[in-house]
Amino acid sequence: MNTVQSLDELLDLAHKHVGVCVSLYMPTYRKGAETQQNQIRFKNLIRDAENQLMQRDLRPSETRELLSPAQELMNNELFWRNQKQGFALFLSPDSFHSFKSPDSFDELVVVAERFHLKPLIRIMARDIVFFILAVSLRNIRLFECTRRQQKEIPLEGIPRGLSEALDLDDFEKRLQLHTGSEDTKAQALKFFQQVDRGLQEYLRDRRDALIFAGVEYLFPIYREANTYPRLLETTISGNPEGLSADELHGLAMPLVEAILQEKENDALSQYRKSAGTGLASRDLREIIQAAHHGRIGILFVAHGVQEWGVFDEDNGRIHMTEPNDPISEDLLDFAAIRTLLNGGTVHVFDPSSVPGGGPIAAVFRY
């Protein structure tokens, strides 16, 4: 079983088009007696998948073979006791992938010619990369992070702290109280300039946000030494020396959410500017055709909503269907995947936040 770790790996799944693909989403419990419900829920959803496969006229032997990896997983008690908030499974005749989510999923089983990926896009599209620089005069640590995980980067060629010959307690006190400040600040600035030069080896050509973690009086000095253009003005304030990687990551999340919110607000602003110019639409049929031709720059789709239908790629016609129709797919999912594959941006919002309050909206490139 392969684990989906990134948006690129998700898009690899999007290329799968092998006749029958099973996509399964479910909430999971992390601890306690409730973890037993994970297996029960999974068993019920696999039964749902069996029924949908029967509607597609698969032979019983084909259904058993396709679902056999899921049946084996069903009986793995250790696996189900080691979950996060949500679980997703993707099965086809030649692939078996899973994803443990930090966010919960609604129960959903989709059997179609493509994998149903919109619930996962909601998480992956917001899983931006960022760096945390934990700074003190005694130690420097650098972490590369996403919303879901973090790892410390071993630093070479970077001073780990000011000279041991200095009385750092006295040095920090003078910095904090601004006594003897010019000479003291000059020493700290020189130290941070060395740190900045060393970081260039790790951050060169990167465009990801850098979050400073350290006491407030050090940040203005570090900012003066810094040459990395994506250093945030907001910081994790306080001495980071006693904080673990997980603790620093947790403190960074409100700052990361603010970055994501700004990007989402910019996208909504772009939609408002484009409305009425022919470069924006809330019409499902128009958007599906635009997604097929790679015209969408920004797409908004509603979380937890499906629009079932069939899009004929040869003639561009769209036929809406019932959810249980074996030939149908979620057209919102189709639009999201096509937009990502063509280099556009997808925002999966709560339905009330999609422009116009509908299930879908888009800004066109042309």
Predicted regions, residues:
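Terminal alpha-helical anchor/extension segments at protein ends
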Residues: M1-Y366
